[in-house]
Amino acid sequence: MFKKFKPVTPGTRQLVLPAFDELTRQGELSGKKTRKSVRPNKKLSFFKKSSGGRDNLGHISCRHRGGGVKRLYRVIDFKRNKDGIEAKVVSVEYDPNRSAYIALLNYADGEKRYILAPKGIKRGDEVISGEGSPLKLGCCMTLKSMPLGSTVHNIEMRPNSGGKLVRSAGLAAQVIAKTPGYVTLKMPSGEFRMLNEGCKATIGEVSNSDHNLCVDGKAGRKRWKGVRPTVRGTAMNPVDHPHGGGEGRHNGYIPRTPWGKVTKGLKTRDKRKSNKWIVKDRRK
C-alpha cells in the first residue's frame, strides 16, 4: 500500500510514499499506544560513514552522490546458514539502506539475525532453513529441494556464497526446469539462467512491492537520500565534458560519456565472459 498527500505545499502535491502498514510498531512490542517505528537491534547495526561517491584517492568514482541524512547499517544474513533451528519473527522493520523491508528473527537458541522480509510475513511467524524445510513463506533451502513453479528470492550464484540475486523490493524469480546438477530460473528481467542445484534461495517474493510507485515530490527529498543533481554535458565547459563549450547547443559528434567513450550502442560486455549459464537472454 502507498499513501498520497493533499497538496498543502508544492512538495506534497506530487508526493507518494509507502504506507508502511507491514512494519511492526513499538506499541505492539511494549503494549503502549504508540505508532513509533521499532528501533534497530543495537548488536546488529553500526554507523557506516558515507563515501560521497569518492574512492580511496578522493576522486569521484560514482557521480550524483553526496550529503544525505546519517544512516545505521543493519547487518543482514544473506547466507541463511543456521540450518535446522526454528526462528520466530520478532518484528518487520524499515531499512534505509535498501528498498525492501527487513525482518528480525529470534532463533530457538537465542541468537538474533536480520533477513530480507518476504511479502506477507508478519510478527509471530516461524521460519527455518536447511534441507527438509517446509515450503513455507520465508523458509530457505537449496534449489533442488524446491518444486517447479516455486517463487523465490535472495538466490545464491554459488553454493554457500550468500544470496546475490533478486533482493530488491517486489522482485521474485521462478523455478522453471531441473536438469542433473542444475536448476533453471526465470529472473525478474526475463532472463532464463541456470544455477547449481546446491545454491540456496528463500521462498516468496521480496516485500514492499509498491516501491516503484513512490514519487519523491521535490528535489529536497532526493537530497535527503544522498542523491545530487544530474548536470547535462552540453551545459558544462570543454574541460569538464566532451559535449561542453561552443557557441550553440550542438556538440558536433555522437554522444559520449564524461570520459570520452561512446555512450549509445557501444557493447561493453567482456567477450571472454561465459554465456553458457544464460539459457535465454533478457533482450531476446
Curated annotation (Swiss-Prot):
Residues 240-250 have a biased composition (Basic and acidic residues). HAMAP family: Ribosomal_uL2_B. Residues 232-284 are annotated as: Disordered. Belongs to the universal ribosomal protein uL2 family. This is Large ribosomal subunit protein uL2. Gene3D superfamilies: 2.30.30.30, Nucleic acid-binding proteins, Ribosomal protein L2, domain 3. GO terms for biological process: cytoplasmic translation. Keywords: Ribonucleoprotein, Ribosomal protein, RNA-binding, rRNA-binding. InterPro entries: NA-bd_OB-fold, Rib_uL2_dom2, Ribosomal_uL2, Ribosomal_uL2_bac/org-type, Ribosomal_uL2_C, Ribosomal_uL2_CS, Ribosomal_uL2_dom3, Ribosomal_uL2_RNA-bd_dom. Transmembrane segments: none annotated. GO terms for molecular function: rRNA binding; structural constituent of ribosome; transferase activity. One of the primary rRNA binding proteins. Required for association of the 30S and 50S subunits to form the 70S ribosome, for tRNA binding and peptide bond formation. It has been suggested to have peptidyltransferase activity; this is somewhat controversial. Makes several contacts with the 16S rRNA in the 70S ribosome. GO terms for cellular component: large ribosomal subunit. Part of the 50S ribosomal subunit. Forms a bridge to the 30S subunit in the 70S ribosome. Residues 264-284 have a biased composition (Basic residues).
